[in-house]
């Protein structure tokens, strides 16, 4: 049988998929051309919000900024950041429209330490590394330091309310522009 655990022989009903009675796919989604975007890997439109080498630790190692976009990701590539952001997606809206895209499906964009953002820490705010960093500063971690309490640059970037509010405001502007073009946005909110 197949459920949320994949193909299994020992069935636990907790993991069974369920249908929501009365749910209907919206008409706008039927037959729409959808384009899924892993924001960090799409396009770097604002270099001021890029994660920098050693900004913080994720899964016991420092994060790194990838400078060669043609480089193959490491096996633990969740710590490698290419710098893609929402400004980059906005910059490429003409290109996406020319492809015939009608719906942008964005991988998670909320505050999270990984590049894929599937381990969201705060669903109320867009991650400033994808949005806007207006208040910056602090220090990156020393080479032998793995303690995020010392990652003052990261803390300032993702905790400062001005950064969080500016990132949310930028996202609202982004969605307005997408809608102005007759397109839709779907957020992956795991």
Regions found by a protein language model. Name each.
Residues 1:
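Short, aromatic- and glycine-rich surface loops/edge beta-strands on solvent-exposed regions
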Residues 8-190:
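Acidic/aromatic-lined carbohydrate-recognition and catalytic surfaces
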């Amino acid at each position: 049988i197949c459920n949320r655990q994949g193909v299994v022989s020992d069935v636990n009903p907790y993991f069974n998929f369920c249908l929501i009675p009365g749910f209907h796919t919206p008409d706008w989604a039927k037959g729409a051309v959808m384009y899924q975007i892993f924001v960090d890997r799409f396009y770097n439109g604002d270099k001021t919000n890029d994660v920098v080498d050693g900004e913080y630790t994720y899964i016991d190692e420092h994060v790194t900024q990838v400078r060669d976009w043609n480089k193959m990701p490491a096996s633990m590539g969740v710590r490698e950041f290419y710098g893609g952001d929402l400004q980059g997606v906005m910059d490429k809206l003409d290109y996406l429209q020319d492809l015939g895209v009608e719906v942008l499906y964005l991988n998670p964009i909320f505050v999270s330490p990984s590049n894929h953002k599937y381990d969201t820490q705060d669903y109320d705010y867009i991650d400033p590394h994808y949005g806007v960093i207006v208040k910056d500063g602090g220090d990156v971690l020393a080479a032998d330091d793995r303690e995020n309490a010392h990652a003052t640059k990261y803390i300032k970037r993702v905790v400062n309310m001005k950064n969080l509010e500016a990132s949310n405001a930028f996202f609202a502007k982004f969605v307005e522009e997408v809608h102005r073009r007759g397109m839709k946005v779907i957020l992956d909110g795991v």
